[in-house]
């Protein structure tokens, strides 16, 4: 591999822990450098997430790197996240190299089986970027903490990559979690001298209140570490979706102007929850995350999102009683919508003849009955569907919709004599609507990103509002990417007001 580090002035964002704010800071740096006329390229050697994006070549990458690419003003490509691990439960993960699935790994065997090929994928990703962008600056994001002593020998994306590229590193610490001084000094103390020399600055993230009150703390950190504190980022609530789906339970903010309550089922193996971001951004909608075992209540609508383990999650809904609550809600005329795995769960039957999902189940089951709200049958296949789509919806009304497929299995109508089903859009395999549940229909789609489409999203919302005797909202011509641009710019404005990025660029 040729030496790509010279002349590229790579910057790297490391964190004292998972959730410190590395993704957000990296996003802000990308947009800030774009404003300065540079060509920033986000890069995370290895990410672990079930929140995926499909790029223009139909390859999988982490959604957070896609957001960073948009912030950089460029098209997301899988080379920006060459290794993606998608947790499947039971200490196993699907391994994605440069957008393609290459196998499933047990955590205990990862280093032995996948470390070398993972590093090769990372080098290939770096070469692809160097070939595609002649003059650029790599903006690297680390993962978790760089000083997990028991894991350092198999750490592909922190210090190994930083040293490989001789990157200038900034260390981000989350003061909201408490113990920020121990986070910073403890992390630095565990670094080897050559590793510590890479740390050029420190950022304090998520500070609540008057930043000037932290001045003595800032001085102490600089004196103790001999590293400058580049700034203090204030608390920015819920800017982007967290990589860890468990963080969804911490979203307790209630909207004062919410008129519509939507129950989103937090499946145990929830994936692609960024599909719900456009609804989260609607000021009149409150999303309430409901887990198996919780009481569904009386929402205006229910959404079942994507799942990494559809059969296991279906079993969880059935055994907890939440599945019956959803069926009762639908039978009383409530709106139910499923996305990808959620669509499969809403069907009549799910068959797994090849045992694709058998390893996740306590007992071997080749088929399960779904919630039977949409008359379709799903058969799981080993081949994964990975395709970007641009189609016309037939329901709730005609509208152009764009998104992507990312799933195992094929669903087809069962031609039930009791229940009629119609296609959701002009491509017959992308989704269906149960025509019997009038006036609001149970429906579902394989199309991730469907709510990003502004007109379609408002059409869907307005049928719910009509049932609730609320006025219709105006249809939107702009899609969610316009809203995302505003959020990225807002984030970057705050970043530039509080963080001395110029210090890193000049040193």
Swiss-Prot record:
Q: Which UniProt keywords apply?
A: Cobalamin biosynthesis, Glutamine amidotransferase
Q: Where is the active site?
A: 340, 448
Show the stretches that span the lipid bilayer.
none
A biological process (GO) of this protein is: cobalamin biosynthetic process
Look up keyword Aminoacyl-tRNA synthetase and say if it applies: no
Q: Does the keyword Transcription regulation apply?
A: no
Q: What's one Pfam family the UniProt record gives for this protein? A: GATase_3
Highest taxon, organism lineage: Bacteria
One Gene Ontology MF term: ABC-type vitamin B12 transporter activity
Physiological role: Catalyzes amidations at positions B, D, E, and G on adenosylcobyrinic A,C-diamide. NH(2) groups are provided by glutamine, and one molecule of ATP is hydrogenolyzed for each amidation.
Q: Which family does it belong to?
A: Belongs to the CobB/CobQ family. CobQ subfamily.
From the Swiss-Prot or TrEMBL record, give the protein name.
Cobyric acid synthase
This protein's species is: Prochlorococcus marinus (strain SARG / CCMP1375 / SS120)
Q: Which gene encodes it?
A: cobQ
């Amino acid at each position: 591999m040729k030496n790509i580090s010279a002349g590229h002035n790579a910057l790297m964002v490391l964190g004292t822990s998972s959730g410190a704010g590395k993704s957000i800071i990296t996003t802000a740096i990308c947009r800030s450098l774009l404003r300065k006329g540079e060509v920033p390229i986000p890069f995370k050697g290895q990410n672990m997430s079930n929140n995926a994006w499909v790029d223009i070549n139909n390859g999988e990458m982490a959604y957070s790197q896609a957001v960073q690419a948009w912030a950089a003003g460029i098209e997301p490509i899988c080379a920006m996240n060459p290794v993606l691990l998608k947790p499947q439960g039971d200490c196993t993960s699907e391994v994605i190299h440069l957008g393609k699935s290459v196998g499933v790994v047990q955590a205990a065997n990862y280093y032995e089986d996948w470390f070398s090929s993972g590093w090769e994928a990372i080098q290939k990703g770096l070469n692809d970027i160097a070939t595609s962008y002649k003059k650029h600056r790599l903006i690297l994001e680390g993962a978790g903490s760089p000083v997990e002593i028991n894991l350092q020998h198999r750490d592909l994306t922190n210090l190994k990559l930083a040293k490989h590229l001789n990157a200038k590193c900034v260390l981000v610490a989350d003061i909201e979690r408490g113990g920020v001084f121990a986070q910073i000094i403890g992390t630095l103390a565990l670094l080897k001298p050559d590793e510590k020399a890479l740390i050029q600055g420190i950022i304090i993230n998520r500070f609540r209140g008057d930043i000037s009150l932290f001045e003595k703390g800032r001085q102490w950190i600089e004196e103790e570490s001999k590293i400058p504190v580049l700034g203090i980022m204030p608390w920015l609530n819920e800017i982007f979706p967290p990589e860890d789906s468990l963080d969804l339970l911490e979203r307790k903010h209630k909207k004062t102007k919410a008129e519509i309550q939507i129950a989103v089922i937090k499946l145990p193996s929830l994936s692609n929850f960024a599909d719900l971001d456009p609804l989260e951004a609607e000021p009149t909608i409150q999303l309430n995350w409901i887990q198996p075992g919780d009481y569904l209540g009386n929402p205006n609508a229910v959404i079942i999102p994507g799942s990494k383990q559809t059969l296991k999650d279906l079993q969880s809904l059935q055994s907890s009683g939440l599945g019956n609550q959803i069926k009762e809600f639908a039978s009383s005329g409530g709106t139910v919508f499923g996305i990808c795995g959620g669509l499969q769960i809403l069907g009549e039957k799910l068959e797994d003849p090849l045992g694709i999902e058998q390893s996740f189940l306590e007992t071997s089951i080749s088929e399960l009955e779904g919630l039977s709200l949409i008359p379709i049958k799903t058969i799981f296949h080993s081949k994964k569907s990975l395709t970007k789509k641009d189609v016309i919806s037939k329901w709730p009304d005609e509208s152009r919709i764009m998104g992507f497929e990312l799933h195992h299995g094929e669903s087809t109508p069962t031609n039930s004599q009791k229940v009629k089903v119609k296609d959701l859009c002009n491509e017959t395999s992308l989704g269906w609507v149960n025509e019997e549940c009038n006036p609001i229909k149970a429906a579902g789609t394989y199309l991730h990103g469907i709510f990003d489409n502004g007109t379609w999203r408002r059409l869907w919302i307005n049928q719910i509002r009509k049932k609730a005797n609320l006025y219709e909202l105006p249809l939107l011509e702009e899609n969610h990417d316009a809203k995302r641009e505003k959020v990225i710019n807002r984030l970057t404005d705050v970043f530039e007001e509080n963080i001395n990025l110029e210090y890193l660029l000049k040193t």
